[in-house]
C-alpha cells in the first residue's frame, strides 16, 4: 500500500490487513521539499514460504550474499526487509544522506499537526471549488457525495489529505489560463508539502503527449 498522501497520521494500513507499506518521504513526511527519500515498512506477517515460486528471491539461496536464504535465516518477520537493506540497497544505491535523514526527522516531528491543517485547508478549498460556476468536477474524498467518502472516513478518521483534483469548463486552455493567474499557489511538479502547489500535467510533465495519449495516461 502506498500511504504517501494519507501518511501514518491519517491512515494505518497494517491495522486493515496490509503487509507492506511504502512512502515517498519527499512529500508530507519531509513537508518542506528539502530532501529526497522513500521508505518501505514491512509488517513481518506475510508468509513468503507459502508461495516459493512467486518469491524465489526470498525462498531460495542468494548467491550474491554467501548463499543465504532470507526466509530461513531471518524468518517471516525479517526476510523481506533484510533483503531490501542487504541486497537491494547494495545494488541500487538508494541510501539517504545523513543531512537528508536529519531534515526528514525534523519534518516527522510536526507531521500530525501539519496534516490536521492540510486536511482542513483542502476541505475548505474543495468545498469552494465544488460550488464555483467555472469548475466542472472536483475529486476529493472529504466531500459528501464523493464515491470514496464513506471509505475515506472508515480508513482515515483523522482526515484524508491535502491533495485535490479538479477540472474546469473550457478544457486545457482554461486550465492554462487559471495557472497563469495564480497569486498564492506555486506552479510546480511537486505535491504534498507545506506550500500550496498547483500542477497541470497536460501542459508540463505530459506536454509531449497528444490528446489520445493523455486520455490513456489518465
What do the predicted segments below correspond to?
Residues 115, 134-218:
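Conserved C-terminal alpha-helix-loop-beta "cap" of PLP-dependent enzymes
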Residues 1-132, 139:
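Conserved PLP-enzyme active-site core in the AAT-like
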